[in-house]
């Protein structure tokens, strides 16, 4: 029993140490050139204009509640604010920090009250899609990686816990038969984004 506890503690420490901030750690910057706050809320907006707007949720397939993470078809729509949180005890988020992502508050029908808001990867029918789900999820975490040193352009990646060589996959867009722009794992076709501070419309 003691050996099992010791091994578990060893894994936690090893994971934490591997992500400790270093002198070369690069903070993820928003559109104001400010570093993203750990636990802060931001809009995630596409760099390429004319191909959709911010990130929101929708119902796909036989879903009654909006459980599929999608890109708004309206390029003027900023979508829903996203909360980015790292388990590391850091004030700001740096590139490649392990992250959980969830939606801030948004209105749903009464039937869907209490539905999950945290992002997860769900694999069904050969497609690994970003969903709001508590079951049938792939264990792992999200990262933010920079794609341009000249601009504050980034991509999201997902790193499966069981992946060989810590291989992570890009988050991209797949347009389904209904024209819905779904966020999915995509090989070498990332959705390139920028992060804008969330400001409530009632503020």
Curated annotation (Swiss-Prot):
- NADP keyword on record: no
Q: Tell me the first and last residues of the signal peptide.
A: 1-25
Check the record and name the SMART domains matching this protein.
Answer: STI
The organism's superkingdom is given as: Eukaryota
**So which tissues is this one expressed in?**
Seed, and at low levels in leaf, root, and stem.
The record's annotation in InterPro entries points to: Kunitz_inhibitor_STI-like_sf, Prot_inh_Kunz-lg
Tagged with keyword Signal: yes
Gene3D superfamilies listed in its UniProt record? 2.80.10.50
Molecular function per GO: serine-type endopeptidase inhibitor activity
Q: List the disulfide bonds.
A: 65-112, 159-168
Which UniProt keywords are given for this protein, alphabetically ordered?
Disulfide bond, Protease inhibitor, Serine protease inhibitor, Signal
| SUPFAM superfamilies listed in its UniProt record | STI-like
Q: What family does this chain come from, according to its entry?
A: Belongs to the protease inhibitor I3 (leguminous Kunitz-type inhibitor) family.
Function comment? Has probably no trypsin inhibitor activity. KTi3 is responsible for most of the Kunitz trypsin inhibitor activity and protein found in soybean seeds.
Q: What is this protein called?
A: Kunitz-type trypsin inhibitor KTI1
């Amino acid at each position: 029993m003691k050996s099992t506890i010791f091994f578990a503690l060893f894994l936690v420490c090893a994971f934490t140490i591997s992500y400790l901030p270093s002198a070369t750690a690069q903070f993820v910057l928003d559109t104001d050139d400010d570093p993203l706050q750990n636990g802060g809320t931001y809009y995630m907006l596409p760099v390429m204009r004319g191909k959709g707007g911010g990130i929101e949720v929708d119902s796909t397939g036989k879903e009654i509640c909006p459980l599929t993470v999608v890109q708004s078809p309206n390029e003027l729509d900023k979508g829903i604010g996203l909360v980015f949180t790292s388990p590391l005890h850091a004030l700001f988020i740096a590139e490649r920090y392990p992250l959980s992502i969830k939606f801030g508050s948004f209105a749903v029908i009464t039937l869907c009250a209490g539905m999950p808001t945290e992002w997860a990867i769900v694999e069904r029918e050969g497609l690994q899609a970003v969903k709001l789900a508590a079951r049938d999820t792939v264990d792992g975490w999200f990262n933010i990686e920079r794609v341009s040193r000249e601009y504050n352009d980034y991509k999201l990646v997902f790193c499966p816990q069981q992946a060989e060589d810590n291989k992570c996959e890009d988050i991209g867009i797949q347009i389904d038969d209904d024209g819905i722009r779904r966020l999915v794992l995509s090989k070498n076709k990332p959705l390139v984004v920028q992060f804008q501070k969330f400001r409530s419309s009632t503020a």
